[in-house]
Structure formats: C-alpha cells, structure tokens
UniProtKB/Swiss-Prot annotation:
It catalyses: an organic molecule + reduced [NADPH--hemoprotein reductase] + O2 = an alcohol + oxidized [NADPH--hemoprotein reductase] + H2O + H(+); 17beta-estradiol + reduced [NADPH--hemoprotein reductase] + O2 = 2-hydroxy-17beta-estradiol + oxidized [NADPH--hemoprotein reductase] + H2O + H(+); 17beta-estradiol + reduced [NADPH--hemoprotein reductase] + O2 = 4-hydroxy-17beta-estradiol + oxidized [NADPH--hemoprotein reductase] + H2O + H(+); estrone + reduced [NADPH--hemoprotein reductase] + O2 = 2-hydroxyestrone + oxidized [NADPH--hemoprotein reductase] + H2O + H(+). It comes from Homo sapiens. Its main location: endoplasmic reticulum. GO terms for molecular function: estrogen 16-alpha-hydroxylase activity; estrogen 2-hydroxylase activity; heme binding; iron ion binding; monooxygenase activity; oxidoreductase activity; oxygen binding; retinoic acid 4-hydroxylase activity. It comes from the Eukaryota. CDD domains: CYP3A (cd20650). Its EC number is 1.14.14.1. Keywords: Endoplasmic reticulum, Heme, Iron, Lipid metabolism, Membrane, Metal-binding, Microsome, Monooxygenase, Oxidoreductase, Steroid metabolism. This is Cytochrome P450 3A5.
Amino acid sequence: MDLIPNLAVETWLLLAVSLVLLYLYGTRTHGLFKRLGIPGPTPLPLLGNVLSYRQGLWKFDTECYKKYGKMWGTYEGQLPVLAITDPDVIRTVLVKECYSVFTNRRSLGPVGFMKSAISLAEDEEWKRIRSLLSPTFTSGKLKEMFPIIAQYGDVLVRNLRREAEKGKPVTLKDIFGAYSMDVITGTSFGVNIDSLNNPQDPFVESTKKFLKFGFLDPLFLSIILFPFLTPVFEALNVSLFPKDTINFLSKSVNRMKKSRLNDKQKHRLDFLQLMIDSQNSKETESHKALSDLELAAQSIIFIFAGYETTSSVLSFTLYELATHPDVQQKLQKEIDAVLPNKAPPTYDAVVQMEYLDMVVNETLRLFPVAIRLERTCKKDVEINGVFIPKGSMVVIPTYALHHDPKYWTEPEEFRPERFSKKKDSIDPYIYTPFGTGPRNCIGMRFALMNMKLALIRVLQNFSFKPCKETQIPLKLDTQGLLQPEKPIVLKVDSRDGTLSGE
C-alpha cells in the first residue's frame, strides 16, 4: 500500500503553491526586529512565539529579560511585539505619547457590544467613556460606598469562621473568590448574593462561566494567527465572550436599572447607581451620556477586571503573612491599635494604616496579577532612537520588572519595608501593578480599598499558619492571569472566641 497518495501533478503543484503562500504569509513580518537590530527569540512560521507562552507568560518575559537585556522583539502570529524596560521609554509610551500614539490596549477581536467597555474601548470612544466614569471612582465616592463593601466584609468573616470551625485547613480561593464575587455583583449589579453558600445562583454560575478565558483559547488563537478573520466572526455574530452569559448579565443590569427608576426611594450609592445618575446628569452635556448597552458593558467588564484579581491578591497576601509570622503580627498590631476591640473599619481608618499599605504594595510587587501592560502603536514613531512601526504592540513586562535585582534587593523575598515612606521613593515606571498614565486601571482605588478592608476584617478575627497541604515554596500557574499552580491552603486560628461583626 502506497504511503504517498496517488494525486495528479496539478494537485501536487496546487498543494505546493498553497504551502509556499502559507509560509510567506506566516513569516511576512518576522524579519522586522532583525532589520532594526533588536534581539529576540526566533519565531516559528505562522505561530510566531506564542507557543513559548505555555511555560507561563511571566516566566517567558523573565527569561527574555535576562537573555536579551532592556529591549527585545517577539511575534504573536504576525503581530510584532516590542518589550521595553527602560523607565524613560515606558514613561513616553504610557504618559507622554498616550493620547497621540499609544492610546489603545490590545484588540481582543470580536467582542460584540463589549467593545465599548472601558478596558476595550479605543481612541475617542475610550476618552469619552473614561471621562464619564472617572467621577464614579473618586475617593469621595468610594467613601460614600464604603458601608456597602463593609457589609460584605462581615459576610467574609462569617464564612471564614464557619470553615475554620470544621477543624480543617481552608482553601483561600473559595473564601476570597466568594467575597470578591459578592462585592462586584453588589456594587456593579445591585444584587446581594452570599455566593459561597449559594453556588447555584444564576449570577454566580454566569460570572464563573464568563471568566473561563485563556490566551490559548482556540478562538483567541485563531484571531492572533489570522487577524483578518475578526470582521468575519463579527458578521457571523461570533464573540470571544459566551453569548448566553453576556445576555443574562446585560438583561440583569437593565432590569435593575428599570426597578430603581420606577422606585422613587433613595437608592444605595453603588457603581450601578452612579452610572445611572451619570446618564441624566447635566455635567455630561460635554460628552454623550452612556447608552444602556454601554452601561451594561461597564458593569460586565468590572467582573472581568475585578473578580479573579482581587481574590488572587488576597490569597497571595495571606500566604505571605502565614509564611512570615513576624509581618502578620506587626500588621495585626497596627490594625488593633487603629481599631481597638475589633471596631468596625471606617474609610479614614483604612487610609491611615501605613503598614497595611506596605504589605499590600509588596504583595502586588511579587505577584502583579496583570503580568504585562500592552499598548498598540497607532503610527510610525521613534522613541529614544528606537523605531516602532505602526500596528505593532509595545509591552511593559511588569512581572519581570518587579523581580529585577537592579531595582529590588533580593527581589524574591517578601519585604514590606521596601515601601516604607522613610525609604527612597519607588520609580512609578518600574512598579506598575495597576499601570500608570491616562490609561491606568480606573478601579485602582476601589480595588485597594476592597482588598484592605478584607485583610483588616480577617486579621482582626483570625491568624493564619502554613499546614502540610500548603505548597512551600509557592509555584505559579502557567495559564492566563498570575495565580498559584495549586490553590493556597492554610490553617486558620481564631484570635479569640468572639465573632467580630455579629
């Protein structure tokens, strides 16, 4: 039996021509960085360097940084990706040339009406939405919203107490994932869910389904390899985000909005209410107000941006506190001094806790959940003698910079004192857990407040210790956002017999 099919000469010729054309298409941009004298790993035809992401984006960036120095070039399919680590160049990209050249983040491909979400919106559309949402995230508004977040802190303590009383080690992701879910659905959708005890709630199920997204998702990969397919997918109504989930969440926002507009009572001040108010505000006359679909897109993107990140950072923080009991005790001492006898936290009390701020900042240095910052180059530009072509993507490898011994002594060590106000100031273009410049994370203040409140509440009531199930040293996962390879498990001891917040 012949192993080679007996095909006509014309068929073989057509096949050969097709393969040559595919090769030419798959390598057409791959000589760019070599011509510019920028080092980097050799790309594969069609794929570029995306297969290297399987080892973990954080690991890939760190290895490239060590091997190639302060700048290197890679390819995602045909897309040239330039990594920069020089603080002056980073400042130019994120701040000085943000509005003119580096306004937009990565294009995800077909996302339907979610393209108006603040994280995905582009150019003038992004500017408009950012200016409409910015008043929602001021410290004054967060202070007004604080009691809402605080009530979920009470639920967090109750749930952790219940788990700890079983006498078994506690999986932190379960507890903090529920807290994060409760806060985000409560503030963005106006619904109260004790998600740990109501896992079948449609909100919980929809949100978790929405979050199952990775860099190696087949649809996402096909868009990286063949970006010209994006308009085809859009015409076919194909979206990266699960359609049934998006529809459910969008309808939920509209239903809650109608309910609040029909009910003339004063409603609690959460993100949803602030966005509804902005639709009717005279202050928005300089910008077109948010449409109902745009409002829904913002509520939905808050889940995507906040759920996994908040629960992961809280888990990482308590892992570090459990493995550094001296730091844990010092932090508990500060909390007890500012809030004696387990007094309920206030906005002002949280803001004044310096050591808590240092602990959270150091955790975000070691574990920046967004491994990279990404900006698309809108036009040919030269920065510090480096030519960056239109259409390429510039990345700032946050994880690699946060672990660079040039900037951090013994970078793998957990040392909150690095962020002491008595020390030299930290370079804002090297330490970027929330990005920096006009397109930084709009929810930064909210995220920090949310995490700090959770830490205060649990540390008022409990102490955390490693147990035999705790993975030491901690290993990081290789997929998607920065998270542990295995869920973090710790022993939880009650600090006394009384339950705070009850």
